[in-house]
Amino acid sequence: MSVADDILNDLHGGIANTLDDLRRELASVRTGRASLHLLDGVRVDYYGTSTPLNQVATLSVPEARLIMVKPWEKNLIPVIEKAIRDANLGVNPQSDKDLVRVPIPPLTEERRKEIVKQVKHKGEDHKVAIRNQRRDAKELIEVAEKDGDIAADDAKKALDKMQKETDEGVKKVDEIVAAKEKEVMQV
């Protein structure tokens, strides 16, 4: 494998990681429907240790606008309820005798537009990350060419492949963002 191939493989892996990161970030964006990803960032004080909610309770979505949290220990119910409330997710958890219900209120049109702006902003941030990776890879190719590790023709081919890879990555970011926008704006 040549130096150019190594650099292109690193770029490909970096772009894939950036796309995965964007998907993960957008999964936790509220859409007006119940999604377990909404509670991903919630941590509970479990015997003095900050523990992710999904490690102390069973989470489920029985209805489109309801998340149910069934703790494995009943004494955690008030702690879980407080943690969800303190997470500033725009939801109001309600505790029962053995579980916590988290009803998801419908989003207003104004709030939907705000969320779409946030989604677009995250998409732009990830496009910039992809372009920065291309810039770094381009610099590596140019240095390798200058040092004589890569022939000029191979460097040109590698730069063309890098541009294609970058364009595909940016296009995928646009597709992911468009799908999330559609999901958020759906009533």
UniProtKB/Swiss-Prot annotation:
Main location group: cytoplasm
A GO CC term assigned to this protein in UniProt: cytosol
Keyword Cytoplasm: yes
GO biological process: cytoplasmic translational termination
Keyword hit for Cytoplasm: yes
Subcellular locations according to the entry: Cytoplasm
Keyword terms, alphabetized: Cytoplasm, Protein biosynthesis
InterPro entries per UniProt: Ribosome_recyc_fac (IPR002661), Ribosome_recyc_fac_dom (IPR023584), RRF_sf (IPR036191)
Any one GO molecular-function label of the UniProt entry: ribosomal large subunit binding
Pfam families xrefs: RRF
Membrane-spanning intervals of the chain: none
Family: Belongs to the RRF family.
Function: Responsible for the release of ribosomes from messenger RNA at the termination of protein biosynthesis. May increase the efficiency of translation by recycling ribosomes from one round of translation to another.
Protein name per the record: Ribosome-recycling factor
Upper lineage: Bacteria, Pseudomonadati, Myxococcota, Myxococcia, Myxococcales
Gene name of the encoded protein: frr
